[in-house]
Structures are given as C-alpha cells and as structure tokens.
UniProtKB/Swiss-Prot annotation:
Mg(2+) binds at D28, S53. The lineage of its organism: Archaea, Methanobacteriati, Methanobacteriota, Methanomada group, Methanococci. Its cofactor is Mg(2+). SUPFAM superfamilies: FMN-linked oxidoreductases. The keyword Transferase applies. It comes from Methanococcus maripaludis (strain DSM 14266 / JCM 13030 / NBRC 101832 / S2 / LL). Its EC number is 2.5.1.41. This is Geranylgeranylglyceryl phosphate synthase. InterPro entries: GGGP/HepGP_synthase_sf (IPR038597), GGGP_HepGP_synthase (IPR008205), GGGP_synth (IPR010946), IGPS_HisA/HisF (IPR050064).
C-alpha cells in the first residue's frame, strides 16, 4: 500500500523545496489576545500551530476564529488528548520520544487516534524531541522529558534517524517555550543529515540572526511562539531572515 501524503503536508513540502525553509507561528489558545496575534502574523507565517496548553477551553471557537482571520493552514499541536478539534486542517500526530513516561511516547497518541480519524484531520507524523534546557520549561515538566544534552548532538541525530525508520516525516527539536537558549546549530545539522526528514526547530529563538543560523544549519521549519506573544511585529524581520536563509541554503546545496 502506498502512503498518501495529504494536501497540507504537500503544500508545506512545496514551500520547503522551493523556498528552502518555512515559518510556523505557534499560538496558545489560552492567550486572551489570540485574535490580535493572528491578525499580526497572517501575512508572514506559512502555517499556524495551535496548542501547547493544558486544559484548553473553547478550542473549537479559537481554532475557527484563527482560521477565518489568517486563511492559513491550521495545524494542531496537542498537549494532550483534549487538544484536538475538527475546526483545524491537520494535526501533528506525534510521539514525545524521549519522555520517561510511556503515556507521552505512545498512549496519548493512541487514545487520540480515533477522534482524529472521526474528525477527518490530516495527520503529519512527527517525532517530538525535548532538548536541553527543556526540563526547565512547562513541557519538560509535564512531559517528564529525559532531555537531550546540547553537548551530545548525535543523540538527537539518532532519535531523528529512528523516527525516519518508524515512518515519521517530521522531527521537532524543541528547547521549550521561553527557553534560555535554542537548539545548537550542530544538533540541527546532524539531525537533518542522518534522518533526511523535515526538521522543525523551536524554543529560545528570539532574533532573526539566530533563525538564519538554524536554517543554514539544516532546519526546514522555524517556530516562534513566546516571541510572537510579546512582540507580534517581530514576525516581520523573522520571516525575512528565514526566507533569506532558505534561499541561501538552496544556493549552497546546489553547488555541492
């Protein structure tokens, strides 16, 4: 049986292939000013990720609002089995591979699978990898993450390779929301080189310069969330840096 890639994933792959990198903005549905954030980012992001909260209220309404405001692909990033709504376009069907708790590795996605099928959501199979300093953030605490040390980039590379063998097409290297520092360039590069799948990098990316470095190191997607909440206008320069890096990376690869 041939594996079918859905419309949203195909669209994102095309952006990555033609522009070298994509920019996703993470919006927390619990943010009171989510409509304002959505209005600010709609002309700059390639897709919107919704999620990251515990005990989300009014997820259907929030997702519908953001979709209507932005007109962009809406991808769910569930913090638990209750983080799914039929109002989205797709969902990251993910495993927190380096959690110490099997609930986050496999049980949670298994429990949510039937709801996803019922809603007809497109699934993007993804390895979610918690990278130092994620243990100091909410997701690290809740997800009981056995964080991957920054000084051991090859471990993230092996997880990403393992994910590709499991059939996952995306790996998210996550330092955590509001992290003190981002995933290292070396770790990004090794993960991309070993796995060949789409590498998403998020957490601690506060400046366009850092975003540029991550893309040039091998990142296919950059995610910002906390930065966007604090300064919605920051997405303008962030997009410029990501897209410039994407084109520069394509030129560099074409010469090899």
């Amino acid at each position: 049986m041939q594996i079918k890639i859905g419309e949203i994933e195909s669209k994102l792959n095309k952006i990555i292939e033609e522009e070298g990198a994509a920019y996703f903005v993470l919006i927390d549905p619990d943010e009171k000013n989510y409509r304002e954030i959505a209005n600010h980012v709609k002309d700059y992001a390639d897709a919107i990720i919704i999620g990251g909260s515990i005990g989300i209220i009014n997820l259907d309404e929030v997702t519908k609002d953001i979709k209507e405001i932005t007109g962009l692909p809406i991808i769910l990033f569930p913090g638990n089995v209750d983080g799914v709504t039929k109002e989205a376009d797709a969902v990251f069907f993910m495993s927190l591979m380096n959690s110490k708790n099997t609930y986050w590795n496999m049980t949670a996605p298994t429990l949510g699978a039937l709801t996803i099928k019922k809603y007809g959501l497109e699934t993007l199979p993804m390895a979610y990898l918690g990278i130092e300093p994620i243990s100091k953030t909410a997701v690290g605490f809740v997800g009981e993450v056995n964080e991957i040390p920054q000084k051991k980039p090859e471990i993230a590379g092996l997880y990403s390779l393992s994910a590709s063998y499991f059939g996952m097409r995306w790996a998210y290297l996550e330092a955590g929301s509001g992290a003190e520092y981002p995933v290292s360039n070396e770790m990004v590069g090794i993960s991309k080189k070993l796995s060949g799948i789409n590498i998403i990098v998020g957490g601690g990316i506060r400046t366009p310069e850092v975003a540029y470095e991550k893309v040039m190191s091998g990142a296919d997607v950059i995610v910002t969330g906390t930065l966007t909440e604090k300064d919605p206008q920051a997405v303008v320069e962030m997009k410029k840096a990501i897209k410039k890096a994407g084109l520069d990376k394509l030129k560099m690869l074409s010469k090899k």
